[in-house]
């Protein structure tokens, strides 16, 4: 398993964040929320932070994961697990993927 772990390239990181951003956008839209609405619920100073995340730039701060999960009507554990899969793919693999014989 460890042999399969590799450092992600900047391009891979960008693609992962963009995929995650599309997922976040779909969750927000499913709730019928605008970016401004979500920013207000989360007490963010700038709604443009939502736009940045949805476009693959930036990360949700770890100390805000549970707030985001609740705002998007998601189970916090599942939400964080998905974030981890895209923000920290090597850590995700170590924690959650089955060892290969």
Regions found by a protein language model. Give the residues of each.
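A short, Lys/Arg-rich alpha-helix, primarily the initiator
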Residues: 2-30
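Alpha-helix N-cap/N′ positions at the starts of helices
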Residues: 16-19, 45, 60
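DNA major-groove recognition helix of helix-turn-helix
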Residues: 42, 53-54, 64, 83
């Amino acid at each position: 398993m460890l042999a399969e772990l590799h450092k992600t390239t900047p391009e891979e990181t960008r693609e992962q964040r963009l995929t995650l951003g599309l997922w976040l956008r779909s969750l927000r839209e499913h709730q019928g929320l605008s970016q401004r609405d979500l920013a207000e619920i989360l007490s963010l100073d700038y709604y443009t932070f939502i736009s940045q995340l949805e476009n693959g730039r930036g990360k949700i701060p770890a100390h805000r994961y549970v707030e985001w999960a609740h705002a998007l009507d998601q189970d916090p554990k599942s939400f964080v697990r998905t974030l981890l899969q895209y923000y920290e793919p090597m850590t995700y693999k170590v924690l959650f993927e089955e060892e290969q014989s």
